[in-house]
Swiss-Prot record:
Belongs to the UPF0603 family. Keywords: Cell membrane, Membrane, Signal, Transmembrane, Transmembrane helix. The chain crosses the membrane at residues 175-195, 206-226, 228-248. It comes from Escherichia coli (strain K12). Residues 264-290 are annotated as: Disordered. This is UPF0603 protein YgcG. Residues 265-290 have a biased composition (Gly residues). InterPro entries: TPM_dom (IPR007621). It is found in: Cell membrane.
């Protein structure tokens, strides 16, 4: 009998020491307490899907009875790390965890949203929207108010691009095409259009035309107008390059050998695209108790 009691005590203590499980992420709202009815889950899910479609921010809700020996912060971090909410590059996931029997709640925010959904804002949402409703045993109402508050914050001040590198790619493409045009223009303008005059005059004429085309493109198609200083530098540099090319070609054509041990070569390096973590959280957010 004594051994049976010892074994029973050991088993009970072992079971009690097991941490709360992290369920598999299969839907936006996971309720392990069965506190929400099907209609409430459907409405909350619809709101979360709408937020994702409008902002690309992934928000998930998890309701558990208790976090046992873990704090709500520890458990929420473990769930976030397991679920990896948010885009891998933007790290813009949000997790709402409610431990209903413990009467604790946590809003865990991904790295990429910590400046948008600050700790202070998350705490205010919990205190002003969730806890008053939870005290009245209105779980669905508190979650709805919190989701609405998060949605207002996300949509009023920030809009996520579907492809974060889209604008960078377009800008890089524009620079690439103009670089090709500039190289060909510097090489062929003096021979196609300006045959007469000294090398300096031909360089000036070519520089004026090339710079004028570039300036016209800025005024017609660009959202930004470069300053006069930038344009002047481009104009001067173009004239210098054309003049140098003409002098080199003239010396070669006249039979004099021209060798340059330190000939310049223009090169560019494409910087690698920025890559984020992978839907992770650094512990940003806030917790509350009622």
């Amino acid at each position: 009998m004594r051994y049976f009691i010892l074994m029973f005590t050991f088993v009970c203590s072992f079971v009690a020491a097991q941490p709360t499980i992290v369920p598999q992420l299969q839907q936006q709202v996971t309720d392990l307490t069965s506190s929400l009815n099907s209609q409430e889950k459907k409405e909350l899910t619809h709101k979360l899907e709408s937020i994702f479609n409008n902002t690309q921010v992934q928000i998930a809700v998890l309701i558990v009875p208790t976090t046992k020996d873990e704090t709500i912060e520890q458990y929420a971090t473990r769930v976030f790390d397991n679920w990896r909410l948010g885009d891998a590059k933007r790290n813009d996931g949000i997790l709402i965890v409610v431990a209903w029997s413990d009467r604790t709640v946590r809003i865990q925010v991904g790295y990429g949203l910590e400046e948008k959904v600050t700790d202070a804002l998350a705490g205010d949402i919990i205190r002003s929207n969730m806890i008053p409703a939870f005290k009245q045993q209105k779980l669905a109402k508190g979650l709805e108010l919190a989701i609405n508050a998060l949605n207002n914050q996300l949509t009023s001040q920030h809009q996520y691009p579907t492809n974060p590198s889209e604008s960078e790619s377009a800008s890089s493409s524009d620079h690439y095409y103009f670089a090709i045009f500039w190289v060909f223009a510097v090489m062929f303008f003096p021979f196609w259009f300006f045959h007469q005059g000294s090398n300096f005059c031909r360089a000036c004429k070519s520089g004026v035309c090339i710079s004028a085309i570039y300036l016209l493109d800025l005024f017609l198609f660009s959202d930004k107008i470069f300053s006069i200083a930038v344009f002047s530098f481009f104009f001067t540099f173009t004239i210098f390059m054309v003049f140098t090319c003409l002098c080199v070609l003239q010396k070669r054509a006249s039979g004099r050998s021209y060798h340059s041990d330190n000939s310049g070569s223009a090169g560019g390096s494409d910087s690698g695209g920025f890559s984020g973590g992978g839907g992770s959280s650094g512990g940003g957010g806030a917790s509350g108790r009622w």
